[in-house]
């Protein structure tokens, strides 16, 4: 408990010094009221018809409206998000143009990947009801902003994709921005040097509790119990880059396969700023 108190004290002290003071410097700040959205729902078939295999794309993409050409904070945040979520090639585009370009590129790549195989099957007389299911792709992206700890704007992106295989894949991306600068915060910007090991130990404790409850397995009381359940077999516990500075706590996200098998799903662990 002493170690837990110490680490949380370090976290709280660092967070106060990094953010609470920076929010009082009188600079213009971004807030979530400036959020706009781009929505896309499209089904693109391999052929110019309505019966050939198709790629279904659904996008609900949030971005910050720039008040004027000099609104560098909103622009910096938008460009950072576009680079991380859509790809670096979209970084200089207007958000609406970036989403549309991303959609078109995805559809073009789908047709390149699948059309040759589809044409071969049609040429060979394969009945349409016997065509491989993986000829149908699906892509979904949902994003949103939320208010985080004082001076911080949180951003969450949730992606779903099916391109064949035993199951679809999904992953999340969490980001934290300083409202008064638009800077994307990394772990090193938030937590003091030397805190990774004790924080990893604390997260391990939280993981044991979470997995024992989720899997309804009372034998999970230690690292060994986790490993017997297929968790942390290929990596040590670590502090992930996917974290969220929320109002009352800091949360950490482990996507599927990060520390556990696909079947376990996404794992979220939280530590309070104060106890």
Predicted regions and their residues:
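Compositionally biased intrinsically disordered regions enriched in Thr/Gly
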Residues: 24-275
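Bacterial Sec-dependent N-terminal signal peptides
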Residues: 1-34
